[in-house]
């Protein structure tokens, strides 16, 4: 016996169609919201539509959100429903972006891209660097093998007090300040929660070596933007690569745009071209698990918010 699964809202046609096709391939009955036992959310940019749509689904048991970051839905995380998200789905694409940004910083590609005349050589070796990664989720799991050929000393800071395979060291957040003092490259790949908001601030930046770099592919809110601007201006760190910013989009008059030590990309760690291809089989598999009463992939802890 199958189950009824709806896809909503129909505001992003390409994503909506992909999700509908995935539901049908899974063996579930694609239905309207009113009859749905499962709901596949089809527009991560429209969380304000959720309450009205969910209210129509009297038999709703499970909600699948498309992205790993679910903070726009934080006010809707009712424990009466089972929640899953896209954590881990986009990790391969985002991990590639991290490596590209890290290499760009180490070779000063962002500086040379802005140059209008020939200049002297600037850059350093990524090989053997002390790399600190905040977050022990899917992005980090995919990133560690990419860093392995560079023989980096990798330190993962994660909430779970458990070694992460592939990392040289794994610590809980209490060790962060101690670790920052020997960090050559700091990578942010963690969930945004009340605990992690502003985790990189003036104090954190002051602990880092002057030659250190930061790569942020998580959420802009992890870094206090004004503190980063000051740290770059005063030479407290050597550079930053930001695929996410706070605010986002970053206003055109923000000083980070003109700072030669800052590389900004417009949240392209996971583009629609990459994301839909990765999300398609994931949705199909999770719906199949739902209708067969199997363990669901990427469950959300409602209490933790991720």
Specify the residue positions occupied by each region the protein language model found.
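Phosphate/diphosphate ligand-binding glycine-rich loop within oxidoreductases
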Residues: 38-113
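Glycine-rich NAD(P)-binding loop of Rossmann-like domains
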Residues: 111-142, 169
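NAD(P)-binding Rossmann-fold cofactor-contacting core
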Residues: 149-166
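Rossmann-like adenosine-cofactor binding region
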Residues: 161-255
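Rossmann-like dinucleotide-binding domain for NAD(H)/NADP(H)
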Residues: 211, 217-306
């Amino acid at each position: 016996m199958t189950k009824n699964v709806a896809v909503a809202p129909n505001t992003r046609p390409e994503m909506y169609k992909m999700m509908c096709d995935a539901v049908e391939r899974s063996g579930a009955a694609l239905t309207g919201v009113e009859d749905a036992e499962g709901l596949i959310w089809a527009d991560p940019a429209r969380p304000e539509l959720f309450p009205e749509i969910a209210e129509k689904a009297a038999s709703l048991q499970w909600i699948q959100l498309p992205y790993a970051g679910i903070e726009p839905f934080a006010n809707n995380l009712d424990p009466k429903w089972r929640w899953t998200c896209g954590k881990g789905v986009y990790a391969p694409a985002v991990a590639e972006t991290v490596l590209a940004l890290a290499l760009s910083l180490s070779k000063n590609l962002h500086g040379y891209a802005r140059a209008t005349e020939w200049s002297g050589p600037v850059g350093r070796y990524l090989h053997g660097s002390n790399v600190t990664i905040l977050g022990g989720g899917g992005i980090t799991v995919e990133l560690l093998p990419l860093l392995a050929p560079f023989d980096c000393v990798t330190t993962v800071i994660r909430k779970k007090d458990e070694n992460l395979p592939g990392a040289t060291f794994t610590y809980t957040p209490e060790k962060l300040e101690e670790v920052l003092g020997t960090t050559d490259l700091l990578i942010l790949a963690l969930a945004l929660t009340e605990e992690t908001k502003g985790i990189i601030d003036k104090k954190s930046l002051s602990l880092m070596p002057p030659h250190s770099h930061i790569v942020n592919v998580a959420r802009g809110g992890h870094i206090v933007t004004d503190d980063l601007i000051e740290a770059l201006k005063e030479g407290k760190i050597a550079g930053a690569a930001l695929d996410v910013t706070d605010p986002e989009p970053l206003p055109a008059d923000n000083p980070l745009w003109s700072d030669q030590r800052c590389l900004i990309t417009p949240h392209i760690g996971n583009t629609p071209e990459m994301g839909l291809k990765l999300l398609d089989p994931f949705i199909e598999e999770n719906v199949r698990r739902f209708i067969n009463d199997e363990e669901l992939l990427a469950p959300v802890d409602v209490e933790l918010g991720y």
